[in-house]
Amino acid sequence: MTSLESSYLDVVAFIFREARLLDDRSWDEWLECYDPEAVFWMPCWDDADTLVDDPRKHVSLIYYSDRMGLEDRVFRLRSERSGASTPEPRTTHNIANVEILERTERQIEARFNWHTMNYRYKLLDHYFGTSFYTLKVSSSGLSILNKKVVLKNDLIHQVIDVYHV
C-alpha cells in the first residue's frame, strides 16, 4: 500500500483500532501499532498557552524515544510493578475530527481530537486533547512513527499514563 492508496477511512480505522486496543488492554497488539523507531511524546504546558518544544530540554508528561520505552511500560503494567496502575483503570476513548494534514509516498501526517473517560477508585476522570501522528506507510499497512499528545486539561488528580491518551 502506498500513502496515495491509503484512504482517509484507513487512517480513521487505524486510529480507532489503537484506541480500542488500549481500552481492551490488548497490549501486544497495541505495541504492534508502533514502529520500532516510534517516538511517543506528551509535552507539558510551559505556561497557560505555550507547550514546551523539546523533550530533551524540558519536562514532559510522557516521553519515550522509541518503542522499547513503550514495551518496558507494558511489561510493568503486566507484572503489576506499576503501583500507579494498580488496580488498572477502566478507560473509554472517544475519537473525533480526524484530519489528514499531509501525505507523501511513505508517510501520512494526521491529527485528531480525543476524550478519554477513566474510572478508578470509584472516581470518574476525564482527559481530553489533540494528538498529532506521523504514520509510516508500508506494504504491511500503517504504523506510528511519531505520536505527540497535547493534553488540554493538565490538572491531573491521580496519574496519567499511555492508556489515558
UniProtKB/Swiss-Prot annotation:
The pathway noted for it is: Xenobiotic degradation; benzoate degradation via CoA ligation
Q: Does the keyword NAD apply?
A: yes
For this protein, what is the EC number? 1.14.12.13
In terms of Gene3D superfamilies, this protein maps to: 3.10.450.50
Q: What keywords are annotated for this sequence in UniProt?
A: Aromatic hydrocarbons catabolism, Dioxygenase, NAD, Oxidoreductase, Plasmid
Q: Catalysed reaction per UniProt?
A: a 2-halobenzoate + NADH + O2 + H(+) = a halide anion + catechol + CO2 + NAD(+)
Position of the signal peptide: none
CDD domains in the cross-refs:
ring_hydroxylating_dioxygenases_beta (cd00667)
Q: Which domain of life is it from?
A: Bacteria
Q: Which GO terms describe its molecular function?
A: 2-chlorobenzoate 1,2-dioxygenase activity
* GO terms (BP aspect): 3-phenylpropionate catabolic process; benzoate catabolic process via CoA ligation
Tell me which family the UniProt entry assigns to this protein. Belongs to the bacterial ring-hydroxylating dioxygenase beta subunit family.
Give the quaternary structure: Heterohexamer of 3 large (CbdA) subunits and 3 small (CbdB) subunits. The heterohexamer is part of 2-halobenzoate dioxygenase two component enzyme system. The other component is a NADH:acceptor reductase (CdbC).
What function is annotated for this protein?
A: Component of 2-halobenzoate dioxygenase multicomponent enzyme system which catalyzes the incorporation of both atoms of molecular oxygen into 2-halobenzoate to form catechol.
* Name of this chain's protein: 2-halobenzoate 1,2-dioxygenase small subunit
Q: Which organism is it from?
A: Burkholderia cepacia
